[in-house]
Amino acid sequence: MLKGIKKLFKRSEEVNAKKDVVNIVEPYKVKINTGLLPVRKGPSAEYDVVGAVKENNTFVIVEEVINKNGEVWGLLKAFRKERNGWINLKYTQKK
């Protein structure tokens, strides 16, 4: 019985380790601190680029995700005509 429980627990850990973790946050501002930062369709470099934001510009983040690679990504509020996009928060400074 104990072996079965250990197997089930291990399988659950493996599945959970591959999921993104969503953090609902109060909207906050970030300043871009790299030359040109790609904006993507989802919270990972694996997603298509939908645009880019320039250094020193400020944007509002409305949601955070820690992806399966451990990177923290932020969802931009109303990026380019009401379309939201994701940026890697590693290249930003919280204001």
Which residues does each predicted region cover?
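SH3-family beta-barrel domains
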Residues: 1-38, 51-55, 64-65, 93-95
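Short alpha-helix capping/helix-loop boundary micro-motifs
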Residues: 43-48
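Extracellular/lumenal glycan-associated surfaces
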Residues: 37, 41, 79
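SH3/SH3-like beta-barrel superfamily modules
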Residues: 4, 52-93
